[in-house]
């Protein structure tokens, strides 16, 4: 009788430990569904995972990355992590470094910086007052210009299209 009680206790302990994770995910899923820190279609980052939310259920949240892979995140992981909801942005930062050879004269460099600034300020994609073109450093083979501006979109797909247009 004692061994049966001990076995039943061990089975009960095993089941309760296994159910603990499920209960934690279920409760976290309920919190996510009620609090709504993100919705299906939103672009989020959780830890190393970034992508579009494609499904939210009581156990997990599915996120599709740019490379089309789908990450399944347990809701307890999501609810205990810092979630960056990029969809809540009203703009996105366009930024790159442009290397200019050292044999470029100062007047040429200043003209290039003025031309880049004027081009970005004239673009319908940018917030004019956010445009920045500065000499930011010196590389092994070039002077480095930091070129940055906020673009008038929060949508990742639209941002990538705008970025492509500006880069061309």
Residue ranges and their predicted role:
Residues 33-36, 101:
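A structural micro-motif recognizing beta-strand termini
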Residues 36, 45, 55:
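Short, glycine/acidic-rich beta->alpha junctions
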Residues 50-56:
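Short beta-strand-centered aromatic/proline hotspots
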Residues 46, 60-168:
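Structured, soluble regulatory/oligomerization domains located on the cytosolic or IMS-facing side
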Residues 1-34, 66-93:
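Membrane-contacting alpha-helices and adjoining membrane-interface segments
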